[in-house]
């Protein structure tokens, strides 16, 4: 929802661009819906799909996979499918580190995670040399990444709709980028795993691949009740009202 609103704000009324925004109907916040659906511009097209975020994303990815089609319309993406977004997100890991850490001190980052884009940017920052100890994948009840780290099996379940809708995702697109990396940049092996996911509904990582992930990541999830409790506690102690994603 936030990405869609920001993209519309950047592209509306541009003569040589059109933007098509997909969102799952009735599964984003009302303010996000209003931001995206009330812009009066001839080059903005908002499409509400009867489904969830994963289904919206699958539809967009299928268009990118059709090379002839995507090239013919000069198609680009504005969420973390686009590598540029990951590159930009890398910056604030460095900024945050230099604001809070001592020289060469290793710190942990806890990142509310849905599509694995933001936290993957942290992983890239670590690979660039930033002294990060662990990246904590913070999830809601859609805890596929936590389950994968614990078992090595990536198996999407039915999406649970929560008070943290930006994390209501079972197929985290950017996790494929991490899989490619821990598979020693073996594109054929990565493709096989992705085909397993599409055809069998799951794939399994080898022990060495899972070990590489655990060296850099850990994960925890919060229930709806736990999320609301954190919001109450922070407000009680700090007089700051945080949103559910921050609470997680």
Language model region names:
Residues 2-248:
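PLP-dependent amino-acid enzyme catalytic core
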């Amino acid at each position: 929802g936030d990405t869609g609103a920001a993209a519309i704000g950047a592209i509306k009324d541009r003569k040589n661009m059109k933007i098509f925004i997909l969102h799952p109907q009735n599964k984003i916040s009302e303010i996000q819906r209003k931001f995206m659906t009330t812009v009066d511009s001839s080059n903005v097209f908002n499409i509400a799909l009867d489904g969830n975020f994963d289904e919206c994303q699958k539809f967009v990815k299928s268009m990118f996979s059709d090379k002839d089609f995507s090239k013919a319309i000069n198609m680009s993406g504005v969420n973390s499918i686009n590598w540029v977004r990951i590159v930009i997100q890398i910056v604030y890991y460095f900024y945050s580190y230099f604001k809070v850490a001592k020289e060469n001190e290793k710190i942990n980052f806890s990142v509310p995670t849905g599509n694995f884009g933001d936290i993957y940017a942290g992983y890239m920052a670590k690979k660039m040399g930033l002294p990060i100890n662990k990246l904590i994948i913070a999830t809601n009840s859609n805890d596929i990444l936590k389950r994968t780290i614990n078992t090595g099996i990536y198996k999407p379940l039915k999406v649970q709709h929560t008070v943290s809708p930006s994390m209501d995702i079972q197929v985290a697109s950017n996790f494929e980028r991490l899989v490619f990396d821990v598979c020693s940049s073996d594109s054929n092996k990565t493709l096989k795993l992705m085909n397993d996911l599409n055809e069998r509904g799951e794939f399994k990582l080898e022990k060495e691949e899972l070990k590489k992930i655990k060296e850099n990541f850990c994960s925890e999830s919060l229930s709806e009740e736990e999320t609301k409790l954190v919001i109450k506690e922070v407000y009680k102690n700090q007089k700051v009202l945080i949103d559910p994603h921050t609470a997680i």
